[in-house]
């Protein structure tokens, strides 16, 4: 009878140990400013359950960093992402932009009623070489500060724009001067010419009349 009870407890879901429910690497390492990946395996029974990645001890009160939504969709939060492969019964955790402070105890876990199946993973972070850190800093500074070449190109472009605008200004002034000549000075000249013609015309008529009068009244020889 006790053997039947033991077998029943073994096959009941949730009664197996954490190592039997979810497994993974006991230790992983990554380099500062790099990334690392952890693959946690689980039995087919937990296919439709939420999986998570948490940090800290004790394990029952660890801080959950990221958790799936019972699907195979990628879930990302800050620098940590998780994806569940329900065909191969593996969920993959990726940590990016690693920092020295990321080193510590983590857990692969499955959310269920009662104690969650969990597996302990020790994460180690190796310090990045100084040359790599200097290269990263130089790249950031280069992206922030404008290069002298670009600045020179901008100045040459502005100078060309100013030079090209001067002929347009001269052409506009010439057009305005021509219009003033046509609409102001030309009518003035025509008016002066008309006045001169009007003044000189009566004088000619008056002179011609006097000559005729002299001829008419001159004595006959």
From Swiss-Prot:
Disulfide bonds: 40-108
Main localization category: membrane
Topological domain spans for side Extracellular: 19-177
Tissue specificity: Expressed in dendritic cells, macrophages and granulocytes. Present on the surface of granulocytes and monocytes/macrophages (at protein level).
SUPFAM superfamilies (alphabetical): Immunoglobulin
Membrane topology according to the record: Single-pass type I membrane protein
UniProt topological domain (Cytoplasmic) ranges: 199-221
Subcellular location: Cell membrane
Stored InterPro entries: CD300_family_receptors, Ig-like_dom_sf, Ig-like_fold, Ig_sub, Ig_V-set
Modification note: O-glycosylated.
Spans annotated as Important for maintaining surface expression and for interaction with FCER1G: 165-170, 177-186
Region named May play an important role in murine norovirus (MNV) binding: 38-48
GO cellular component: plasma membrane
Stretch forming the signal peptide: 1-18
The Ig-like V-type domain, residue ranges: 19-124
Chain ranges passing through the membrane: 178-198
Keywords tagged on the record: Cell membrane, Disulfide bond, Host cell receptor for virus entry, Immunity, Immunoglobulin domain, Membrane, Receptor, Signal, Transmembrane, Transmembrane helix
GO MF, one annotated term: virus receptor activity
GO annotation terms (biological process): immune system process; regulation of interleukin-6 production; regulation of tumor necrosis factor production
Job of this protein: Acts as an activating receptor in myeloid cells and mast cells. (Microbial infection) Acts as a functional murine norovirus (MNV) receptor. Primary determinant of MNV species tropism and is sufficient to render cells permissive to infection by MNV. Can render nonmurine mammalian cells susceptible to MNV infection.
Subunit details: Interacts with FCER1G.
Protein family membership: Belongs to the CD300 family.
Protein name: CMRF35-like molecule 5
Species: Mus musculus (Mouse)
Gene assigned in the entry: Cd300ld
């Amino acid at each position: 009878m006790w053997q039947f009870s033991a077998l029943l407890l073994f096959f009941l879901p949730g009664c197996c140990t954490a190592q039997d429910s979810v497994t993974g690497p006991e230790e992983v390492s990554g380099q500062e400013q790099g990334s690392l990946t952890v693959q946690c395996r689980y039995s087919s029974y937990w296919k439709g359950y939420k999986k998570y990645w948490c940090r800290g001890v004790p394990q029952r009160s660890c801080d959950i960093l990221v958790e799936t939504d019972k699907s195979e969709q990628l879930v990302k939060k800050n620098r940590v992402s998780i994806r569940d492969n329900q065909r191969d019964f593996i969920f993959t955790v990726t940590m990016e932009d690693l920092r020295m402070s990321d080193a510590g105890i983590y857990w692969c876990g499955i959310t269920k009623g009662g104690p969650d199946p969990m597996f302990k993973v020790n994460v180690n972070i190796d310090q990045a070489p100084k040359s790599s850190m200097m290269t990263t800093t130089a790249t950031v500074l280069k992206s922030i500060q404008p290069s002298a070449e670009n600045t020179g190109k901008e100045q040459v472009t502005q100078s060309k724009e100013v030079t090209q605008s001067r002929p347009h200004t001269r052409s506009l002034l010439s057009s305005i001067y021509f219009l003033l000549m046509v609409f102001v000075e030309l009518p003035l000249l025509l008016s002066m010419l008309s006045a001169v013609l009007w003044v000189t015309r009566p004088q000619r008529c008056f002179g011609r009349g006097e000559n005729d009068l002299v001829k008419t009244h001159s004595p006959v020889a």
